[in-house]
């Protein structure tokens, strides 16, 4: 029987005392993270190039907790191990970038206001989901904090595996991961579709259907700009500045939620209608990378225009569309529904004629128009791209071993 891991996120309703304790828990885990990072930095910079591993730092936890029982000794041992694993993962990524010749970017120290998550690797070890089952109100218990009320708006299916505390502005959330049996697949429809992601239209299907791009970030840009300007004028560490910061956070939170809502609804519509969905294997990070500077050979120290301003506008539009989030949601929904999703190479999908197969840059005279210079076929460029994506996906599916 197939099993999947699904995440649930619920708003917590802590008391005043619990809110203070949750903040102290984040503060102390942040201190542990920074202390462990300092030890690793010192070892890396030492002439001996000593390597500090996770096991060595985890073995020190018992001594650290005994030395500081009021702070480090107050919290779950397992959650502190998870924080050290988090640092270890960042360090491994750093050394991997060093070996590959990329830009290393050493892990940085975290400010207490920039450390917003504490993980509990196992339900029942330092935490307990639904800790008062006899009570109609759902609660989650954390070591050192107590039973915190939870606004459970949906049922949790399966066995809870991990629990995390997350702070967003002044709100507190509990995030669960649960292992559950794959549900029964949706009835087959016999339909297949290819999708072409875009900016003007959020996506275009191989059938010629266009899904509008809501541009949530652009719609909220004026309000965000005004709120951020008001924030910049406030005196630091004042109540007025805190209120202004809360307003900026609320606007960003609203944009993020609307973007997620649109992604969920669009993905659900595709999964319900089609048995097979092909999409472009987009390298979004590469697409939104800043252009390299162009030195001026005639003026040492000067640079020529490299189109950075126009590229920045395109990058904002790509981020606003949220392609990566949408594709992640689409894959998760398809897995639960028993549908098949396949990523294909996007090269030349919008330049290849679906009628005669001729591929040329001249086939696309404008952003929206496709006109084959060989056979004269005309169509919307995004619809042509989606159709070629579908055909490539079907070919790849047929080539896969049974």
Predicted regions and their residues:
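Positively charged, helix-rich recognition surfaces that bind polyanionic ligands
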Residues: 6-9, 20, 141, 152-161, ...
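Acidic carboxylate diad motif detector
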Residues: 55-166, 304, 310, 316, ...
């Amino acid at each position: 029987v197939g099993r999947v891991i699904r995440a649930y996120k619920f708003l917590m309703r802590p008391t005043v005392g619990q809110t203070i304790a949750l903040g102290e828990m984040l503060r102390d885990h942040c201190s542990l993270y920074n202390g462990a990072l300092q030890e690793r930095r010192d070892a890396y910079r030492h002439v001996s190039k000593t390597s500090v591993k996770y096991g060595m730092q985890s073995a020190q936890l018992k001594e650290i907790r005994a030395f500081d029982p009021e702070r480090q000794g107050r919290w779950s041992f397992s959650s502190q191990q998870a924080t050290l694993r988090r640092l270890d993962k960042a360090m491994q990524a750093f050394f991997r970038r060093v070996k590959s010749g990329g830009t290393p970017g050493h892990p940085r120290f975290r400010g207490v206001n920039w450390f917003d998550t504490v993980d509990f690797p196992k339900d029942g070890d330092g935490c307990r989901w639904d800790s008062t089952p006899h009570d109609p109100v759902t609660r989650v218990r954390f070591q050192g904090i107590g039973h915190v009320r939870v606004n459970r708006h949906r049922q949790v299916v399966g066995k809870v595996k991990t629990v995390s505390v997350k702070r967003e502005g002044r709100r507190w959330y509990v995030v669960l991961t649960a292992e559950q049996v794959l549900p029964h697949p949706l009835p087959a429809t016999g339909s297949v579709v290819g999708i072409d992601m875009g900016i003007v239209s959020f996506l275009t299907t191989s059938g010629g259907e266009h899904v509008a791009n809501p541009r949530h970030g652009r719609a909220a840009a004026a309000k965000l700009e005004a709120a951020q300007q008001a924030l910049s004028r406030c005196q630091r560490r004042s109540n007025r500045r805190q209120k202004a910061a809360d307003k900026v956070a609320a606007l960003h939170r609203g944009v993020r939620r609307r973007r997620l809502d649109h992604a969920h609804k669009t993905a659900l519509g595709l999964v319900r209608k089609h048995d097979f969905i092909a999409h472009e294997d987009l390298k979004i990070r590469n697409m939104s990378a800043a252009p390299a500077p162009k030195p001026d050979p005639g003026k040492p120290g000067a640079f020529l225009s490299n189109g950075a301003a126009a590229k920045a506008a395109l990058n904002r539009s790509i981020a606003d569309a949220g392609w990566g989030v949408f594709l992640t949601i689409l894959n998760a929904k398809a897995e639960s529904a028993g549908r098949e999703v396949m990523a294909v190479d996007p090269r030349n999908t919008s330049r290849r004629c679906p009628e005669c197969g001729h591929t040329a840059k001249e086939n696309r005279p404008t952003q929206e128009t496709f006109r084959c210079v060989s056979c004269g076929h005309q169509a919307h460029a995004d619809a042509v791209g989606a159709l070629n994506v579908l055909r490539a996906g079907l070919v790849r599916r047929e080539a896969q071993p049974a």
